[in-house]
A protein has these predicted regions:
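N-terminal signal peptide c-region/cleavage motif recognized by signal peptidases
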Residues: 16-18
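N-terminal secretory signal peptides
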Residues: 1, 12-14
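N-terminal pro-sequences and low-complexity stem/linker regions of secreted or lumenal proteins
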Residues: 6, 11-12, 21-267
């Protein structure tokens, strides 16, 4: 999608047909989330970008992935179920993107490939054939859209290719990429301005899977998130999915119904 079409869709997204659920945010106004690859909590918690998340946000110290390999974990994050063990299934299942698109006004989902191309198995919206409003490439594109091309309420999925998300490349490179994302969000009025009810956009960051017990680093970050908090409440990818649907005031998806929402960053 070119920039003109992208901005046209974003402008149109504030309107929707009648008869659908009202769009409401409970804890945040918009959601940005991204995922790194294949490292356990203790392997990465000391990285500079992760220490920044710990200082300025809320770390979920007992957060776990739900499966192996990558694909099922990504699907669990956005749809509340793994839908099998295959890396990709390329089949429609309800996801946070499809239910958000059904609200009034609709809340659109955008996918940003910040470095290279997100692998298909790491792009659950593509895998689940979700309704995505726009696909953009490069951190500069995100920075430009944050300056005026995004609706006030949106879901942004940000990702990197396997050389830049710690799958194949060094931790230092991935760390720099996450730091660049944090700097970009912190410098944008879109991410740092509350809505009429005082809610800010929020960033959720985690790893898809780890070693053995699958405990991974996960954190929430943003102006509305409690700073310097470490939660010891157990959570999983299903809990993230449950948190998104609860924030929208919608029923939970699939197995996420059996998980509680992540509330510690706001309570």
């Amino acid at each position: 999608m070119d920039r003109r079409a992208f901005l046209g869709w974003a402008a149109a997204a504030v309107f929707g047909p009648p008869g659908r659920a009202e769009a409401r945010g409970r804890w945040w106004s918009s959601l940005v989330f991204g995922v790194f690859e294949n490292h356990g909590f203790d392997e990465v918690a000391g990285l500079p970008s992760h220490r920044r998340l710990a200082r300025e946000g809320t770390v979920l110290a007992r957060y776990s992935a739900v499966a192996h390999p990558s694909g099922p974990n990504y699907r669990a994050l956005v749809s509340g179920a793994t839908w099998g063990t295959a890396q990709t299934i390329e089949t429609f299942h309800p996801s946070i993107a499809s239910i958000a698109a059904g609200l009034v006004p609709p809340i659109p989902t955008f996918v940003y490939h910040l470095e290279g191309e997100i692998a298909r198995r790491h792009n659950p919206f593509l895998d689940l054939r979700a309704p995505v409003a726009g696909v953009r490439h490069g951190l500069a594109a995100l920075r430009s859209d944050l300056a005026g091309g995004l609706p006030p309420a949106a879901v942004l999925y940000v990702g990197w290719d396997d050389l830049n998300n710690m799958h194949d490349g060094p931790p230092a490179r991935a760390d720099q990429n996450l730091s660049a994302l944090l700097d970009t969000l912190a410098a944008s009025a879109w991410f740092t301005t509350p809505d009429r009810e005082g809610r800010y956009p929020a960033l959720f960051f985690c790893y898809d899977e780890g070693r053995l017990a699958n405990r991974v680093f996960a954190a929430w970050w943003g102006r509305g998130v409690r700073r310097g908090r470490v939660s010891q409440v157990p959570h999983t990818h299903y809990g993230f999915c449950r948190t998104v649907t609860d924030n929208l005031g919608l029923p939970p998806l699939a197995r996420a119904a059996g998980s509680g929402p992540i509330t510690e960053p706001w309570t």
